[in-house]
Regions:
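Active-site acidic carboxylates
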Residues: 1-103, 107
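Alpha-helical scaffold elements lining the catalytic groove of polysaccharide deacetylases
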Residues: 108-129
Length: 129
C-alpha cells in the first residue's frame, strides 16, 4: 500500500523525559513497558524512516504552567501530574527526549490533556502543512 508523503504525518505523543527517562517521576510506572516493547527504539526508527520519506513528524507534548493554573480539574492522571511536579513548561522533564529531537519538524502547542487536538494547533498543522 502506498502513501503520499505530503499527505501523511507521524504524531509523536508525549515522548517526554518525565515519562521516558530514568530518574524522572513517571518513568517507574512505564519502565517495564518501554523496555519490553522497545518503545523508544521503535519510535526513533519510525521517526527516522518518516523523515527519510519526507513525512512530517510532529511532536505533541503535554505541558503546563509552572504553577499548574492551566491544569483544570485535578482528578485521575492530572492529579498525579501536579502531585509529581511533572510536565511543567521550561523544565527538563517537559522536554521531548533527545533521541527524537532531530526528527521532529514541529511541536504542537497547548496540549493540556489526553486529546492531542483539543485546545491545540494540531489540526492546523496537519491541514496546512
Amino acid at each position: 500500500m502506498g502513501f503520499k508523503a505530503r499527505e501523511t504525518a507521524v504524531v509523536m505523543i508525549e515522548f517526554q523525559n518525565d515519562f521516558c527517562k530514568p530518574g524522572f517521576p513517571l518513568y517507574p510506572g512505564v519502565e517495564q513497558i518501554l523496555k519490553e516493547y522497545k518503545v523508544i527504539e521503535n519510535a526513533v526508527e519510525l521517526a527516522k524512516g518518516a523523515k527519510a520519506k519526507g513525512v512530517l513528524v510532529v511532536g505533541c507534548p503535554i505541558t503546563f504552567e509552572p504553577d499548574y493554573k492551566d491544569l483544570g480539574q485535578e482528578f485521575g492522571i492530572k492529579a498525579n501530574v501536579k502531585k509529581g511536579g511533572t510536565f511543567r513548561k521550561g523544565t527538563k522533564g517537559a522536554e521531548f527526549i533527545d533521541e527524537l529531537k532531530p526528527y521532529v519538524d514541529i511541536y504542537v502547542e497547548g496540549k493540556r490533556g489526553l486529546d492531542g487536538f483539543h485546545g491545540t494547533n494540531l489540526d492546523t498543522i496537519l491541514r496546512y502543512r
